Amino acid sequence: MAFMKKYLLPILGIFLAYYYYSANEEFRPEMLRGKRVIVTGASKGIGREMAYHLARMGAHVVVTARSEESLKKVVSRCLELGAASAHYVAGTMENMTFAEQFVAKAGELVGGLDMLILNHIHYTPLGVFSNDIHLLRRTLEVNLLSYVVLSTAALPMLKQTNGSIVVVSSIAGKIACPLVAAYSASKFALDGFFSSLRMEYEATKVNVSITLCILGLIDTDTAMKAVAGIFNAKASPKEECALEIIKGGTLRQDEVYYDSSILTPLLLRNPGRKIMEFFFLKKYNMERFINN
């Protein structure tokens, strides 16, 4: 009986919560009304669609990407759709100073922050890895390091609002995929960093959620051009994908899976990992790090 109380019941609780709790939460668009949200990589594709969804929900939206002309159009459309306010800051996430300063600027523009959606990537064409260390370094800097810089800069504001960090990742960050070695490495690294960070937040009483979004092939122009004639799979609609990302972040889910195949979440969700993390965390004395 003691063994059951100490081990089996917590395991069962984790398993049930992992599979059912988040799915049973009800999302309502009004949850985003008046919320202050940053979306990176928002000049096109999934990022642009997220900005439009947030605008329809009445959020304050701050978007960033490299193309100022594209961002101007996104902001104009957001205002037409009903955004409480919409702003843009153009720049490249290859520049870590810009990444840090962008968060501060965004906070000034909308008076704080409730949600940070990290969506930008460094484009890497499909191909066999040919020892291009420069490409690998640049991919890791944009796809990983800038995410760390942005989330670190945003944390003080997110702590004030019990906010959320939403990290857009990929199936290529959960399973091995050919022709995308550098990209895949950056996405696996996102899982490792932000999943560990989530555990630290929970253990040290930081009420900021982290949602990792694992996406399959999405029908963005960039993705469709990249995989043409190489990868044979059904692409999912970017509009619906964008909405699912927003829902998952708003409901503070640990992970969101979005793919054309219903098997993807069934096969990739890993209750064994959650159980291991639960018991591993108990081996640490985290009290000394609370409020530090």
Curated annotation (Swiss-Prot):
The keyword Transmembrane applies. It is found in: Endoplasmic reticulum membrane. The chain crosses the membrane at residues 7-24. GO terms for cellular component: endoplasmic reticulum membrane; intracellular membrane-bounded organelle. Expressed highest in liver and ovaries (corpora lutea, granulosa cells, thecal, uterine caruncle and intercarunculer tissues), lower expression in kidney and spleen, and lowest in the adrenal. Keywords: Endoplasmic reticulum, Membrane, Oxidoreductase, Transmembrane, Transmembrane helix. Its main location: endoplasmic reticulum. PROSITE patterns: ADH_SHORT (PS00061). It is an enzyme of class 1 (oxidoreductase). GO terms for biological process: steroid catabolic process. The keyword Endoplasmic reticulum applies. It catalyses: an 11beta-hydroxysteroid + NADP(+) = an 11-oxosteroid + NADPH + H(+); corticosterone + NADP(+) = 11-dehydrocorticosterone + NADPH + H(+); cortisone + NADPH + H(+) = cortisol + NADP(+); a 7beta-hydroxysteroid + NADP(+) = a 7-oxosteroid + NADPH + H(+). It is a single-pass type II membrane protein. Its EC number is 1.1.1.146, 1.1.1.201. Pfam families: adh_short (PF00106). GO terms for molecular function: 11-beta-hydroxysteroid dehydrogenase (NADP+) activity; steroid binding. Controls the reversible conversion of biologically active glucocorticoids such as cortisone to cortisol, and 11-dehydrocorticosterone to corticosterone in the presence of NADP(H). Participates in the corticosteroid receptor-mediated anti-inflammatory response, as well as metabolic and homeostatic processes. Plays a role in the secretion of aqueous humor in the eye, maintaining a normotensive, intraocular environment. Bidirectional in vitro, predominantly functions as a reductase in vivo, thereby increasing the concentration of active glucocorticoids. Belongs to the short-chain dehydrogenases/reductases (SDR) family. Homodimer. This is 11-beta-hydroxysteroid dehydrogenase 1.
